[in-house]
Amino acid sequence: MNKPYTKPDYEQELRRAGVRITRPRRIILNILNETEDHPDALEIFRRAVEEDDSISLSTVYRTIKLLEERGAIHRHAFAGGPSRFEQASGAHHDHIIDMDSGDVVEFHSDKIEKLQEEIARSLGFEIVHHRLELYCKKLKS
């Protein structure tokens, strides 16, 4: 999916907030910045040790917690699996979760967004935030 936005420089934002950017944190930030999938903590750990085998799983968990607290990443708890993560930047999108493979596909639909707004408004509400997850199986050819 082409993303028509520039990802913010979370490293600079974290520095301004007084967070030390260690080599492991930089590696983990880069993994989350460059990925198009939604890795779980173990996958982030696997990718991190490819770059620096001194990074521990506990370092990954602590860094994820810090990044989440600072608003740099979003945690997704898709049904039937571990928490998965993505950078918090960018345009709003929803997710399709392939129930067979666990793959996550991002999508955006103006029709769906408009319909949600209409439904909320008709019931006397204004949407502040929402998250749409569609659990699907691939169509058979």
Swiss-Prot record:
GO terms for molecular function: DNA-binding transcription factor activity; transcription cis-regulatory region binding; zinc ion binding. The keyword Iron-sulfur does not apply. It is found in: Cytoplasm. Disulfide bonds: none annotated. Zn(2+) binds at residues 38, 86, 95, 106. Pfam families: FUR. Keywords: Cytoplasm, DNA-binding, Iron, Metal-binding, Repressor, Transcription, Transcription regulation, Zinc. Fe cation binds at residues 92, 94, 113, 130. It comes from the Bacteria. Residues 90-141 are annotated as: Dimerization. One of its GO terms (cellular component) is cytosol. One of its GO terms (biological process) is regulation of secondary metabolite biosynthetic process. Residues 1-89 are annotated as: DNA-binding. InterPro entries: FUR (IPR002481), Fur_C (IPR043135), WH-like_DNA-bd_sf (IPR036388), WH_DNA-bd_sf (IPR036390). Belongs to the Fur family. Acts as a global negative controlling element, employing Fe(2+) as a cofactor to bind the operator of the repressed genes. Homodimer. This is Ferric uptake regulation protein. The lineage of its organism: Bacteria, Pseudomonadati, Pseudomonadota, Alphaproteobacteria, Hyphomicrobiales.
